[in-house]
């Protein structure tokens, strides 16, 4: 063990992963988290890694970008993905978790680590440059610290408006109407589906558009812009009569056996719903259900009224209503190196959603990289970048100054980006079939990361300070 302590500010997904990686490298960590003493507009607990939006980490299959990212994280023994696997709930082809058990387990694991010192205080300023620090405060960074970050960077923060979906009690839905199925019968029938005919859909859309919105502060109204990957359902409804039907309410691939023979074309065309609202388990028992894709800024009374129009949800009881909040992120291409160090202070790192990555697995990946590099710096080594061929490497390259694409686009400001196969380098041999090409990307990534990990293991083990905690 070495004496130099690394400070990690924020115990969300990125901060939790970073703290775990650092401590397991034999480096002491001070993990600073302001909750529960000071909360945010979206959090409800003081637990680490609380999931405030969806409970899904995205597709599991490695021929999907999110699935490859999860696979890469497993190679590096990611605490976040290990914990997600342990508390997974059925979600078809996706990795979804019981959010309460997930965050409770993260908190317990980190609290019991001998090299992690937890401080439940609000961080009001950036530590001095003598301290190795990881900024993992997330999109809901407190105002005081956000102002200090702006002073340090000299750049106003970027922001967008994000929203969370409502959660309802599973025993309050009508199972005579709602049916269980996964799209195209992929995996277990993990979703509950509320079918709508054309009249029901049209009425529901009209009510959504006319529904009364929760108030935004004046400064928020002036600069309101939504993140396209997490639009409020009422905003989607306003974009066109069929926009919801080709988005979160699409019915294709979903079939209730009560409707008869799926392979009878006439029957299929006659019985197929005009739209379907999906519900996903929040816990293994299905006592709590998330309304998939139903992020909203409707007033709570309007949510209860309008969402009860949905067939099968006429008597729905709400555990949590949807909320909208302002998310802050850095203009990373102008500020960060691919190692996630700040260009103007290499002892300071940023990780997670504050860097402009989108999605839970991507946040964990940022924490993983920042944690590894903070450990290396603490040991007197040089920070590393992940291979370009990996999803982690390509994503971090894209948000950093190493990739000039975003910073050179003066008309289009930098916006959060999810993992995507469009970010990774092309294969040397062209593969026309998309699925086969993505599988080839996956195999290439695994191959290069296994080599990369062996090199890292050598660096961490050469002074015999690597700590392994089961």
UniProtKB/Swiss-Prot annotation:
InterPro entries: FAD/NAD-bd_sf, MnmG-rel, MnmG-rel_CS, MnmG_N, TrmFO
Enzyme class: transferase
Coiled-coil portions: none
Presence of the UniProt keyword Ribosomal protein in the record: no
Binding site for FAD: 10-15
Role played: Catalyzes the folate-dependent formation of 5-methyl-uridine at position 54 (M-5-U54) in all tRNAs.
Family: Belongs to the MnmG family. TrmFO subfamily.
Record protein name field: Methylenetetrahydrofolate--tRNA-(uracil-5-)-methyltransferase TrmFO
Organism this protein belongs to: Prochlorococcus marinus (strain MIT 9312)
Lineage: Bacteria, Bacillati, Cyanobacteriota, Cyanophyceae, Synechococcales
Gene expressing this chain: trmFO
């Amino acid at each position: 063990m070495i004496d130099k302590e690394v400070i990690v500010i924020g115990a969300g997904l990125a901060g939790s992963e970073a703290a775990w990686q650092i401590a397991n490298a034999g480096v002491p960590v001070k993990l600073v988290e302001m909750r529960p003493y000071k909360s945010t507009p979206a959090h409800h607990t003081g637990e680490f890694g609380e999931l405030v939006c969806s409970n899904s980490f995205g597709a599991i299959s490695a021929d999907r970008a999110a699935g490859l990212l999860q696979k890469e994280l497993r190679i590096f023994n990611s605490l976040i993905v290990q914990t997600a696997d342990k508390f997974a709930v059925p979600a078809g082809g996706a990795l979804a978790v019981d959010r309460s058990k997930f965050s409770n387990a993260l908190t317990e694991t980190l609290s019991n680590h001998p090299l992690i010192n937890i401080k439940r205080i609000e961080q009001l300023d950036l530590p001095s440059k003598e301290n190795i620090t990881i900024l993992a405060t997330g999109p809901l960074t407190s105002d005081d610290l956000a102002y200090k970050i702006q002073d340090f960077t000299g750049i106003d923060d970027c922001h967008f408006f994000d929203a969370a979906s409502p959660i309802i009690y599973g025993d309050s839905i009508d199972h005579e109407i709602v049916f269980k199925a996964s799209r195209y019968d992929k995996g277990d029938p993990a979703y509950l589906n509320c079918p709508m005919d054309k009249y029901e859909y049209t009425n529901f859309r009209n009510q959504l558009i006319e529904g009364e919105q929760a108030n935004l502060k004046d400064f928020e109204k002036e600069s309101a812009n939504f993140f396209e990957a997490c639009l409020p359902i009422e905003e989607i409804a306003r974009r066109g009569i069929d926009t919801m039907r080709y988005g979160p309410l699409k019915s294709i691939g979903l079939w209730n056996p009560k409707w008869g023979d799926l392979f009878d074309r006439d029957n299929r065309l006659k019985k197929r719903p005009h739209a379907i609202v999906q519900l996903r388990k929040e816990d293994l028992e299905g006592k709590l259900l998330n309304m998939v894709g139903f992020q909203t800024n409707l007033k709570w009374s309007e949510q209860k009224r309008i969402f009860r129009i949905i067939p099968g949800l006429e008597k729905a009881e709400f555990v949590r209503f949807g909320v909208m909040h302002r998310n802050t992120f850095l203009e990373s291409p102008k500020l960060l190196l691919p190692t996630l160090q700040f260009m103007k202070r290499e002892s300071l790192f940023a990780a997670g959603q504050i860097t402009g990555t989108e999605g839970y697995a991507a946040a964990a990946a940022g924490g993983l990289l920042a944690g590894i590099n903070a450990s290396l710096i603490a040991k007197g080594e040089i920070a590393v970048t992940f291979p370009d061929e990996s999803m982690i490497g390509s994503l971090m390259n894209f948000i950093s100054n190493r990739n000039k694409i975003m910073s050179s686009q003066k008309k289009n400001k930098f916006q959060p980006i999810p993992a995507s196969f469009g970010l990774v380098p092309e294969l040397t041999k062209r593969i026309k079939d998309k699925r086969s090409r993505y599988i080839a990307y996956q195999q290439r990534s695994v191959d290069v990361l296994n080599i990369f990990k062996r090199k890292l293991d050598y660096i961490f083990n050469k002074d015999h300070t690597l700590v392994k905690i089961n």
